Amino acid sequence: TRTRINGIEAQASTGATDSSGGVNRGRGFDFNVFASELFNNITVRKTSSAEVEEGSLGATVDLRTSRPFDKMGFQGALSGQYGYNDLSEDWSPRFAGLISNTWADDQLGALFSIAYSERESLEEGFSSVRWGPASADGGFQNGSVLPSPSTTYHPRIPRYGSLEHGQERLGATLSLQARPGNGPTLFTLDMLYSKLDSTRSENFLQAWSLSRGADQGGKPQVDIVDFAIDPDTGEMTYARLDDMDIRSEQRFDVLETEFKQMTFAVEHEFSDRLRFNGLIGRAESSFGNPVQVSAIIDRQNVDGYSYDFRENRNLPAINWGFDVTDPAQWSIVGPTGAQPRSELRSSANFQDNVYTTGEANFAFELSERLTLKAGVSRKEYESSSRAFARLANGAPALPAGVTMADVTDLRTGFGKNLDLPAGAATSWIRPDLEALQTVWDYRCNCDTGVAGGDFRLVGLNGNPSTYGNWREVTETVTGGFVQADWNLEIMGLPVRGNVGVRQVKTEVEALGYSNVGGVATPVTGQNEYEDTLPSLNVAIEPMEDLIVRFGAAKVMSRPPVTSLVPVFALSAVNASSNTASLGNVELEPYRAKTYDLSVEYY
């Protein structure tokens, strides 16, 4: 699905949790950047036609902001909401306003609208972080007690999660229209602005050992004390384990998206039969995740840990094996301690997307029943990504005299409306990021000189872990179409539709960076390809209130941006699951032949 705003393709990006995809570095459109009040109408094109730009295997969604000539004269509107979320226990204000007027016998018009909202939400639940085979990561210390370790599966990181989301959104539109002398020419200038500022605090209580190898103090050190396996699925639905490593994590993100778009459109009627419309426009989306910090504290080698899915597949009973609310039971394992060592992760991510579009289209009515259309277009898409991170995620040891109680706090109230199993933890100790800032000064972007205290955020100038997220892709698309629209009666039945063909050429340039001896080495690539895309759409009304629709087309969708950069990447050689990836600027687009048939009754 492709999204256009005021006639041109656009992209708005933001960031999600890691489990939901993280930073949007692809072609996806994040609708939550905008308030719905900013738009006057939405059109969903479920089938392709030659006059509509290519780029989607399915639908095209067209959004349009309000314009003064939508309703002549002075107009105004104001709305407000004040909602309450009983889970986050917070109020969420929202308001929108619009003012519009036309002058000079409706030859000139201006419209301004604004929308503002705040929202606090809470997300809680259990996550397995996927299931893995018991034989992975070196297997259990006494894995032979299992009948078939390779076909027995357990949760990789069983954990409770509590996520707090904060959101502030401001959007505005300005539209100016002119029809000089109330004549055949209409000029429209549309401007759209939106700013989404978000924060997210993620809190996790998690069992760590089941997804790590021996080098990280993982599964090969864990003893199976008792277990139960579902014979139908091979899932280890219950396990009691000794020597488990338990972790508590707090992560905090600051996320900022700014979207700006301007389009200028001209419509002109040369005669009753010949019409022209054209537009130029630019849409810019800038996303920043300048703060992404996670602190992780540990309790190593816990005996008596257990999980049990037998009563509830989605929400197991978990016994953590110790008092998770006592700060003295937790520790920060410094650079010289046993694995797994505690962590202070810090990074920053940025993504910019720009669309620049121009098009010109003509329509000529051969008769009341038949209209011929033709047009040309040119579009440039630029995607730029950057990332910075610490060189190593290890945490420093606590200074002398600083206790765990000084750098932690108690997360309380977990599990509202979750119907947790009896005895489940509803509170636990978590790292206190502000207290750790006071102790470690991790926001300094500097090397403090203590072991584990290098808090510099490094990108292309020496941090290979970030190289894969430094890339630039430019696509230049030149296209044209011809199309015939008809509105006929055949044997007394209304028949309307269109048939046409679109020809498009795509030119791609990609830049990425490979790790050559620890040095970021630029790698570039170019490609171009052409597509011929015919389409047919027919709608027949065999009887009143009944419409039968048929569509057939060749369609194409361009490859993911992240796959176009010609860079080879390899996971750590000693990692439990080694992976390699290679981008390819010469990837062809996804191509398909689509057929649609629908019957609609009104």
Please report, for each region that a protein language model flagged, where it lies by residue:
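Extracytoplasmic beta-strand/coil segments of soluble accessory domains associated
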Residues: T1-T17, K46
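Outer-membrane beta-barrel translocator/receptor signature
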Residues: A12, G21-F29, E37-V44, E51-S144, ...
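Outer-membrane beta-barrel and related beta-rich outer-membrane complex signature
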Residues: G15-T17, R119-W131, T188-D223, D243-R247, ...
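Outer-membrane beta-barrel transmembrane strands
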Residues: A59-T65, Q81-Y82, W91-T102, I157-E202, ...
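Flexible glycine-rich, low-complexity coil/linker segments exposed to the extracellular/periplasmic environment
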Residues: D137-P155, K219-M244, Y305-R341, A397-N469
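Outer-membrane beta-barrel domain signature, especially the mid-to-C-terminal portions
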Residues: E202, G304-S306, G512, A520-N527, ...
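Extended hydrophobic/aromatic segments used for targeting, binding, or gating
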Residues: I224-D226, S294-N314, T506-V538
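Outer/extracellular conduits and scaffolds centered on Gram-negative outer-membrane beta-barrels
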Residues: M404, L410-T412, K416, L420, ...
